[in-house]
Regions:
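Conserved small-domain helix->loop->beta segment predominantly found in fold-type I
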Residues: 182, 193, 197-242, 251-268
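Flexible, glycine/charged-enriched surface loops at secondary-structure junctions
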Residues: 169-172, 189-195, 207-219, 255, ...
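PLP-dependent enzyme catalytic core of the Aspartate aminotransferase-like
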Residues: 198, 263-340
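Conserved PLP-enzyme active-site core in the AAT-like
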Residues: 1-210, 231, 276, 284
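Active-site lining segments that contact anionic ligands and/or coordinate catalytic metals
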Residues: 143-145, 222-226, 246-248, 268-273, ...
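Composition- and surface-driven signal marking solvent-exposed, interaction-prone regions
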Residues: 161, 240-242, 255-257, 288-289, ...
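A common structural junction motif
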Residues: 247-251, 300
Length: 340
């Protein structure tokens, strides 16, 4: 929908490269990315600071200036956000440069929508984004789905891009569940989002103390729900994703900056990505992250038999059988006056 509203086929857009945290939906045609292959956009990558694990503001300003003045082909859209999203992106630092070039700003909040709703991440619309796309089923813990939000000046365009341009129907059966999830975010979101980030930082520290190379140590590892780990000293991400799953520990293999240059492929990259939203929702706190880190270490570093680790994970998990940050009963949900 964002592409339909803000661009035409053949336009230029800026986004993160996938090894730098970008999502396939913003990828180039030659990599089967949605932006290039489906909408026909020419994708230019944001310059990226690998040490800071974020967009390089100064180099981005220089790149946009060159696109405008020398190449005479300014971007029409700048897409912030991604699938590896450790720190808030520099929207407010780049909004003037991007808008001055005649481009619109979109922000992919699929992974961090719950943190934004909880007031613990950046506020992209108020920092200058023209539209925000999001998932309703990640850190925002509702049924699977998505949404695009914006201020009123783009509202009608987004509605028309949604129907009839891109969709003909939506899943009505999920709306009630989403409404309850949104109400729970209003009631519990601040505490929930804060605990997620606290747990992620603690998990990063615990993994670091056990010898794993956790990215962005000098910045406290993360300001989101995600922790990124370079495991090339011991194994590769695709192999360990499978091994950890066999041990009942679910992580994602993750392309990291430098993987492509090193000849690694997205099916077996150099990293893993770990999120803390699910374990937070079942009641885990900062103090439990050392045990979670130990399970991961046993598989990756110690090369313990996943079956044995699985038994220990199951025993540990028995202590967390309740969903937190939610209404205790249907009555609580239906009587929640803030959504009336």
């Amino acid at each position: 929908m964002v592409y339909t509203v803000f661009t035409n086929p053949g336009d230029r857009m800026m986004a993160l490269a996938i090894p730098n945290g970008g999502h396939i939906s913003t990828g180039r045609k030659e990599f089967s990315g949605t932006a290039g292959a489906v909408h026909g956009l020419e994708v230019e990558y944001f310059p990226f600071d690998r040490k800071e694990m974020n967009i390089d503001v100064d180099k981005t300003k220089q790149k946009i200036a060159k696109m405008v003045t020398e190449e005479k082909n300014a971007p029409k859209l700048a897409m912030f956000g991604g699938s590896l999203f450790l720190f808030p992106h520099p929207v407010k630092e780049l909004v003037e440069t991007i808008h001055s070039a005649g481009a619109k700003i979109a922000y992919d909040a699929a992974h961090v929508a719950g943190l934004i709703a909880g007031g613990r991440f950046q506020d992209p619309l108020r920092e200058g984004a023209d539209a925000v796309s999001l998932s309703t089923h990640k850190t925002l813990f509702g049924p699977q789905g998505g949404a695009v939000i914006s201020f009123e000046n783009y509202g009608e365009q987004i509605k028309k891009a949604t129907f009839p341009s891109n969709t003909s129907n939506h899943h009505l059966h999920s709306l009630a569940g989403k409404a309850i999830a949104f109400a729970e975010m209003l009631e519990f979101g601040k505490e929930y989002a804060g605990q997620i980030i606290e747990n992620a930082k603690a998990l990063g520290q615990a993994l670091h103390e056990r010898g794993l190379t956790v990215l962005a140590e000098h910045k406290g590892f993360t300001e989101s729900h995600q922790v990124a780990v370079d495991i090339t000293k011991y194994a590769l991400g695709g192999d360990m994703e499978k091994a950890l799953e066999s041990a009942n520990v679910i992580v994602n293999r993750q392309l990291l900056p430098g993987d492509i240059q090193a000849g690694r492929h997205y099916t077996n990259p150099g990293g893993i990505r770990i999120g803390t939203s699910e374990i937070t929702r079942i009641g885990m706190k900062r103090s439990h992250m050392s045990e979670v880190a130990e399970f991961i270490k046993r598989v990756i570093i110690n090369k313990d038999e996943p079956r044995k680790v699985k038994e220990d994970v199951a025993a540990f998990r028995k202590g967390f059988q309740k969903v937190h940050y939610c209404f205790e009963s249907a009555k609580d949900a239906y009587e929640y006056i803030k959504i009336r």
